[in-house]
């Protein structure tokens, strides 16, 4: 559990375009020790936040199909953060949103009228944004967030040999940390974005996870932390959730957990399986996209596998049908939530020729959750085996 939103700290960077555990570090966890206090103050002084946490915006054109995706992205962010959206073309601090197919998919970083520029208007282009998640990505830039792969600590997780200007890491003095590095973040590019072999994860199980456009739990958490979102009364949220600043009567829940306190299952597309000791059982689950009132453009089916107390749950994939193999697994895929922090994205698979396929995943989470996600309406299937053992494991 840690703290990271890549937010601006220097004017010469702020005007550039960008394309597409909930405890925090203490000051001694970051290089410089006591100097971190100074760095954080400097960041807050030079930062480029939307005042009052409100994005004032208007549309430059009228591509209705793209506007619907923009509206869905707005609804998703507003539902998970304290950020407000106000359609007002005359506000002194405003965002001009282009939806024409002639526009790109990019945004200036940070709010207008602050350190990102003296003008009261900046722009965001959405015409080429393929899905809702891509537009959430661009709004995140406007809210002040850099790409995940440019974090100053990225070299602990990525081997980047690209000399591309946009691939360079941001220095410590220009960021402040609000969460863990996440390969599956919506702000991460796929591994071949700068060329084959130019940006590889040290943990190669994450290669196809990079470039996802599913919004993660930590993606929204980091925005909440940067903007100081919170509630005067904290709920007793379960399973790593926290009181939602958009509605203080409920919790923001990690994926797979539902209800006011994150201690419930969803009533539909939810499967409970009980593992047996030492003996593999086989299960096939069908999954496909279904519309929801608030969505990042994907729909997930969840499988909950339980074993005896203090046991190790083991899972291995046996088959994937109608699952599209692509960088970032951006159409559909399978995530077995086996990593130590169950709120962070575990490695995602969508290809039969990758190392994850047929690997035996070992997890101490009881239950261990399998998330089967899709933005395709045609059904896909995943076949897997599961059991529990009593051996000890090291997370990973």
Curated annotation (Swiss-Prot):
Give the Enzyme Commission number. 3.4.24.-
Q: Signal peptide: which range, if any?
A: 1-20
Query: In the UniProt entry, which residues are flagged as the active site?
Result: 138
Provide one Gene Ontology cellular component.
extracellular region
Name the UniProt key words of this record, in alphabetical order. Answer: Disulfide bond, EGF-like domain, Glycoprotein, Hydrolase, Metal-binding, Metalloprotease, Protease, Secreted, Signal, Zinc, Zymogen
Instruction: State where Zn(2+) binds.
Output: 137, 141, 147
Q: Tell me where it mainly resides.
A: secreted
Question: SUPFAM superfamilies, from UniProt?
Answer: Metalloproteases ('zincins'), catalytic domain (SSF55486)
Q: Which cysteines are joined by disulfide bonds?
A: 82-229, 105-129, 231-251, 253-262
Provide the residues annotated with a glycan attachment (glycosylation). 63, 79, 310
Domain (Peptidase M12A): residue spans on this chain: 44-230
Question: Does the keyword field hold Glycoprotein?
Answer: yes
Cofactor(s) recorded for this entry are:
Zn(2+)
Q: What does this protein do?
A: Metalloprotease.
Return the protein name.
Zinc metalloproteinase nas-24
Q: Which gene encodes it?
A: nas-24
């Amino acid at each position: 559990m840690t703290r990271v939103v890549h937010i601006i700290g220097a004017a010469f960077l702020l005007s550039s375009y960008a394309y597409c555990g909930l405890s925090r570090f203490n000051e001694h966890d970051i290089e410089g020790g006591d100097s971190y206090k100074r760095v954080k103050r400097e960041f807050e002084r030079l930062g480029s936040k939307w005042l009052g946490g409100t994005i004032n915006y208007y549309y430059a054109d009228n591509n209705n199909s793209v506007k619907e995706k923009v509206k869905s992205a707005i609804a998703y962010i507003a539902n998970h953060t304290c950020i407000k959206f106000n359609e007002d073309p005359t506000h002194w601090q405003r965002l001009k949103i282009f939806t024409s197919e002639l526009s790109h998919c990019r945004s200036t970083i940070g709010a207008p009228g602050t350190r990102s520029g003296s003008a009261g208007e900046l722009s965001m282009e959405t015409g080429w944004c393929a899905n809702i998640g891509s537009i959430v990505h661009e709004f995140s830039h406007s809210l002040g967030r850099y790409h995940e792969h440019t974090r100053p600590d990225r070299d602990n997780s990525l081997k980047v040999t690209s000399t591309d200007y946009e691939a360079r890491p941001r220095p410590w003095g220009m960021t402040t940390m609000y969460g863990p590095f996440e390969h599956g973040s919506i702000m991460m590019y796929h591994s071949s974005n700068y060329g084959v072999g130019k940006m590889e994860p040290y943990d190669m199980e994450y290669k196809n996870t990079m470039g996802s456009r599913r919004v993660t739990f930590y993606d929204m958490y980091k925005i909440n932390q940067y903007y100081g979102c919170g509630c005067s009364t904290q709920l007793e949220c379960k399973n790593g959730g926290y009181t939602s600043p958009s509605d203080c009567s409920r919790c923001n829940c990690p994926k797979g957990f539902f209800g006011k306190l994150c201690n419930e299952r969803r009533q539909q597309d939810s499967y409970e399986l009980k593992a047996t000791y030492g003996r593999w059982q086989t299960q096939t689950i069908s999954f496909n996209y279904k519309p929801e009132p608030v969505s990042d453009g994907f729909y997930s089916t969840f499988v909950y596998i339980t074993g005896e107390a203090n046991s190790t749950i083991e899972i291995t994939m046996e088959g994937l049908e109608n699952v599209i193999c692509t960088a970032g697994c951006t159409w559909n895929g399978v995530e077995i939530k086996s990593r130590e922090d169950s709120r962070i994205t575990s490695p995602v698979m969508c290809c039969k020729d990758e190392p994850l396929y047929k690997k035996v995943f070992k997890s101490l989470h009881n239950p261990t959750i399998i998330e089967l996600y899709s933005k395709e309406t045609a059904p896909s299937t995943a076949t897997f085996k599961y059991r529990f053992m009593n051996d000890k494991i090291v997370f990973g």
